[in-house]
Amino acid sequence: MKNIAIITGASSGIGKEFLLNMPKNIEVDEIWAIAREKNFFEGLKEESNLNIRPFSLDLEKETSLMKIKDLLEEEKPNIKLLINAAGFGKFEKSTNISLEDSVGMIKVNDMALTSLCLMAIPYMKKNSNIINIASVAAFQPVPYINVYAASKAYVLSFSRSLGKELSKEGIHVLTVCPFWTKTKFFDRAVEKNKVIKKYVVMYDPTDVVEKAYIDMQKKKSVSVYGFIANVQRVLCKLLPHNFVMSIWCKQQKLK
């Protein structure tokens, strides 16, 4: 039985950093790297000597998820690490975002993530790990990032509950909640009119991933990198959400 890791969103950003910086104590025979982009593997080969098995799959489509399910049933690997880093957002007034994009966010950010967790768990043993990528937006409702923030709140709640359920089996679940991070995420998220205008700080994905792996080894349930991000996390616990939303809208000069 071969040991594998599965990483979605592996072609760029946080997902790619998770792949390239995987701790040496996680010994796997193969990394299943999943990304929507075609031919993304060529770039990864130049940056890594890991045994990467690439899959060009759009996780918004159920057929893509079924391909993974069928492959797991066929090969029956031992999954030592699952990282759900695929996802996208749209920054705009909710009624100005296409229905296709709004539903697509839920399909990729939530449905695909949930499906992959439930598919993978039967092939995981004690000391295996699941890392799900949420966002600091998961801690509060965020106008003009409405569906995205709600989808990440789901990821946080689902992951923490799942971690509790799996703890007796020795399977650990970590939720990573990044603040603004320098990735290609914004190429798709930001519309031409740029509703979101102010980014307090922009973190490097390598730092986010480094802390996440450290927190995984420490068996933490949530990983938040950066002083400002952690301040926001605390304030969202202490302050009424109506007040937090008002501050956000004022900061972005939104009505």
Regions found by a protein language model. Give the residues of each.
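Substrate-binding pocket helix/loop in short-chain dehydrogenase/reductase
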Residues: 93-103
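Conserved glycine-rich Rossmann-like NAD(P)H-binding loop of the short-chain dehydrogenase/reductase
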Residues: 23-43
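Residue(s) in the substrate-gating loop at a strand-loop-helix junction
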Residues: 135
